[in-house]
């Protein structure tokens, strides 16, 4: 009978809880539908909650029994044969839902405050904290002098404006204000025009050659017409333009004047060897490879002392560069030793149509000791276009002398031989037959009156005197033919033939180019 009362009381409690849950469901459904319905629901639910609360408070069982005695000490568990639904077991209600307090029904959402929505402005949008956002930083570069002086905001444009032009000063700044202040201070000291700001899209292309970079004036900006001409969307981006393979007469004259007037100030990567008529470059480590390339094409180099990575000669002809690399790896034990390239060369020859003759080179490669540069002196440069042929004859004679001296050297290794270039180095062994044959073939092909690309009687006369000193003989059918014509004309006119070589500016005959033969060391 006692168990039935407990079960009935538990049933009432559960029914009250069920009513309470239903009231909460109705409250949730009616929330927001209408204010009147919500107020009525609030007036009804407190009564039910009070009933549930009073039932829980006034509930007392008719009889309370203590825990039966246990057979062993320390065991406080109940007897499994007796009911365990006692008042002490029913202190908390056996449900997962929290009992509502009457005050909760007076506050919506069970007393949890709802934050008020802030009114968003239609024009002002809240910004995020920018402490963690990294914005790209733009540097500014000031090119103080040179043909493309100005203020740039792109390193690629700055590099194109300064690469290959020695003596150009440039510096990086973090802001445009600092760059403008530095540029204005420089132009004020130098009393030159104010430097313009050149954005990335408006940078002009780099000049084609080293000589043009220093001689050509800066290009003026084009002024677009407002009527009749459509302005393009953007100017072309700067590019890296390779050097032209053929050197022009203007480039040669500029380089000739540059090396003649160089006094050694401001550039420690080169020094000069000065003679009466011509001066030659001597390039040291970290020299400008583009300048080395153009001086090589002009025949104005005496010696090159490259770095271990050979960056100074990277623009020389590929076969010459490969021969130098093979020398470092195959011919010397310590590949970290410094080397040198000693060059004997002719100079180019031009006609009205353009380049007639490219320089011929004999290059010796060897291990370099300590470089002691000679003092560079500023020499007078009064060469004219009319003097180029005479200068070409002079360098041609010196080239022939250097080539014939190879016959006196008994230990030579030929690294590379082509139609116009011979590269050799010293050897610990005697010159073998293959290398000797390569040298003789190159001498027979090059040593002639057509050395400079045209038949030059002065060259023939020099070869004849040089060979006669060695006990040999030299004949040129062009000179014999011209001599016979002169003798016939003298006999008819009653004049005598003048002795000595004919003038160098005789009729230019195109050089007969023989087949190219090459020898490379694997």
Curated annotation (Swiss-Prot):
- Gene Ontology, cellular component aspect: host cell cytoplasm
- Give the matching Gene3D superfamilies: Ribonuclease H1, N-terminal domain
Query: Where, per UniProt, does this protein localize?
Result: Host cytoplasm
Q: Which UniProt keywords apply?
A: Host cytoplasm, Translation regulation
Specify the superkingdom: Viruses
The GO biological-process annotations, alphabetized, read as: regulation of translation
- A single Pfam family it belongs to is Cauli_VI
> Family assignment?
Belongs to the caulimoviridae viroplasmin family.
Q: What is this protein called?
A: Transactivator/viroplasmin protein
Organism of origin is Cauliflower mosaic virus (strain D/H)
